[in-house]
Amino acid sequence: MVRVARSVNARKKRRSILAAAKGYRGQRSRLYRKAKEQVLRSLVYAYRDRRKRKSSFRKLWIIRINAAARMEGVTYNRFLQGLKLANIELDRRSLAHLAVHNPDTFSALVGVAKDSLKNAPDPVAAPRLRGTSSRT
């Protein structure tokens, strides 16, 4: 029976793992087993955080829009409501960009939102009877 020579493949695999672990601290960049564990964990973190990054940026955009809107005297919620009433469909990313880089344009949008809030009809709430719920 012929032996299977795998030294080339094994060396290539080890070299690729150690190359991926380059820059890690201590044994994690030098010892194969430790490096392999850390590289696998790093790939898990990378996968998870690619999804997490989307919500992190959305939170950042909302914070920036809220801060800029409050400087103009309106809250984030009322500002977006006013934009919706004015049929202005800008996403949070572009609104945050305008708030940071083009404050004049953003304040014009705030003015439009305020005007549409003033001119909007008040929503009339239906009177609720005591003891009844809206769920059926």
Swiss-Prot record:
Belongs to the bacterial ribosomal protein bL20 family. Binds directly to 23S ribosomal RNA and is necessary for the in vitro assembly process of the 50S ribosomal subunit. It is not involved in the protein synthesizing functions of that subunit. This is Large ribosomal subunit protein bL20. GO terms for cellular component: ribonucleoprotein complex; ribosome. InterPro entries: Ribosomal_bL20, RIBOSOMAL_L20_CS, Ribosomal_protein_bL20_C. The gene is rplT. CDD domains: Ribosomal_L20. One of its GO terms (biological process) is translation. Gene3D superfamilies: 6.10.160.10, Ribosomal protein L20 (1.10.1900.20).
